[in-house]
């Protein structure tokens, strides 16, 4: 919800163009992505898309693929999740100026408190990396088999806290390159200080856009 408010008040996005879904079911996720596709299509390449997800992710233990876990999904059954590969395909095909994705989730099977969510073996799983396509860049809260930790005293995940902090400090007028550097540095430091374990956010741009994404801004 906090990111939604920042989109409207800090980035200046029109309220009608911002959708917020809490406790999203699998059908909710699919419906909202369809809405985004429809809206972007009518702007005929003039719009920019921002997708933010905070929640659980789970791994497929057989092929190491990653899934978002909706509220009606089961941590032990990936067929009840939404494949990250499908998300990237849907967003990467948008006919937009840019697509920026923020995922405050990990896909190792671990919960924010360090317990295991899905893995029958009780060990974190390193999922395979999905490569973004189109005009898309993806910011993820953690890499490989890491856990995306909470920042309990701040009421957010570590990743989301520093994302919002930088947007607030700059009033949204910051390049994605500088935003990514800031988030990665601060989350790595704070995760070690607070949890004693490294959480290292990653930034994955589509190969077709080169380094051009580093000059993109969310508010312009």
Residue spans of the language-model regions?
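Cysteine endopeptidase catalytic domains of the caspase/legumain-like
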Residues: 1-220
């Amino acid at each position: 919800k906090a990111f939604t408010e920042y989109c409207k008040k800090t980035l200046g996005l029109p309220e009608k163009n911002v959708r917020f879904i809490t406790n999203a079911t699998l059908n909710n996720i699919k419906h909202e992505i369809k809405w985004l596709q429809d809206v972007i299509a009518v702007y005929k390449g003039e719009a920019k898309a921002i997708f933010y997800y905070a929640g659980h992710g789970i791994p497929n233990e057989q092929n190491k693929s990653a899934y978002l876990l909706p509220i009606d999904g089961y941590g032990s059954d990936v067929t009840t999740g939404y494949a990250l590969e499908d998300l990237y395909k849907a967003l990467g095909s948008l006919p937009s100026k840019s697509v920026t994705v923020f995922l405050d989730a990990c896909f190792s099977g671990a919960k924010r408190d360090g317990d295991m969510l899905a893995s029958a073996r009780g060990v974190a799983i390193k999922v395979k990396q999905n490569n973004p396509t189109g005009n898309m860049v993806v910011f993820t809260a953690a890499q490989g088999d890491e856990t995306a930790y909470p920042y309990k005293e701040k009421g957010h995940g570590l990743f989301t806290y520093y994302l919002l902090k930088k947007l607030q400090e700059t009033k949204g007028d910051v390049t994605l390159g500088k935003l990514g550097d800031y988030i990665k540095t601060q989350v790595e430091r704070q995760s070690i200080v607070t949890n004693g374990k490294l959480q290292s956010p990653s930034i994955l741009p589509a190969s077709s856009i080169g380094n051009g994404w580093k000059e993109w801004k969310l508010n312009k």
